[in-house]
Amino acid sequence: AAAMKNVTELNEPLSNEERNLLSVAYKNVVGARRSSWRVISSIEQKTSFYLKMKGDYYRYLAEVATGEKRATVVESSEKAYSEAHEISKEHMQPTHPIRLGLALNYSVFYYEITAFDDAIAELDTLNEDSYKDSTLIMQLLRDNLTLWTSDQQDDDGG
């Protein structure tokens, strides 16, 4: 490819053979890079997918763990989801199924594990009217989450 580049810089018309050689040389150079890029892209997708799974399984553990163990698995889940999110933002289109699935599961984590628990812990500090409004909203959130997760399971064939 370097030799053919030098030939083109002479500003002389290329023969058919030279044009074909130039085309083949650059096709081979670009083809090797495209192949390398596909491998890297595949690795990034797999990494994001497995980190998402890791976050999911820690989230499942957080649903049943208590005390110090719960805090540890919540932190591990957050870390895995966060790493997967950073990789997917950098290497995947916003519409990529892995990236979208990650967004859904990460939002479930925030709802089920962090936000909902935080809200429940504060319910006893509310006055009666606020308590009713807050519990209604929390129930609507839980209903939406149930709907979203059942839709995702249907789409996954499960």
Curated annotation (Swiss-Prot):
Membrane-spanning parts: none
Keywords: Cytoplasm, Mitochondrion, Phosphoprotein
Residues modified as Phosphotyrosine: Y60
Top-level taxon of origin: Eukaryota
SMART domains: 14_3_3
Localization terms from the record: Cytoplasm, Cytosol; Mitochondrion matrix
Pfam families named in the record: 14-3-3
GO molecular function per UniProt: insulin-like growth factor receptor binding; phosphorylation-dependent protein binding; protein sequestering activity
GO biological process: positive regulation of cell-cell adhesion; regulation of neuron differentiation; regulation of protein localization; regulation of synaptic plasticity
Modification Phosphothreonine, positions: T72, T149
GO CC aspect terms: cytoplasm; cytosol; mitochondrial matrix
Region (Interaction with SPATA18/MIEAP): 1-158
Family of the protein in this entry: Belongs to the 14-3-3 family.
PANTHER family, sorted: 14-3-3 PROTEIN (PTHR18860)
Described function: Adapter protein implicated in the regulation of a large spectrum of both general and specialized signaling pathways. Binds to a large number of partners, usually by recognition of a phosphoserine or phosphothreonine motif. Binding generally results in the modulation of the activity of the binding partner. Promotes inactivation of WDR24 component of the GATOR2 complex by binding to phosphorylated WDR24. Participates in the positive regulation of NMDA glutamate receptor activity by promoting the L-glutamate secretion through interaction with BEST1.
Quaternary structure and partners: Homodimer. Part of a complex that contains DSG3, PKP1, YAP1 and YWHAG; the complex is required for localization of DSG3 and YAP1 to the cell membrane in keratinocytes. Interacts with SAMSN1. Interacts with RAF1, SSH1 and CRTC2/TORC2. Interacts with ABL1 (phosphorylated form); the interaction retains it in the cytoplasm. Interacts with GAB2. Interacts with MDM4 (phosphorylated); negatively regulates MDM4 activity toward TP53. Interacts with PKA-phosphorylated AANAT and SIRT2. Interacts with the 'Thr-369' phosphorylated form of DAPK2. Interacts with PI4KB, TBC1D22A and TBC1D22B.
Name of the protein this chain belongs to: 14-3-3 protein gamma
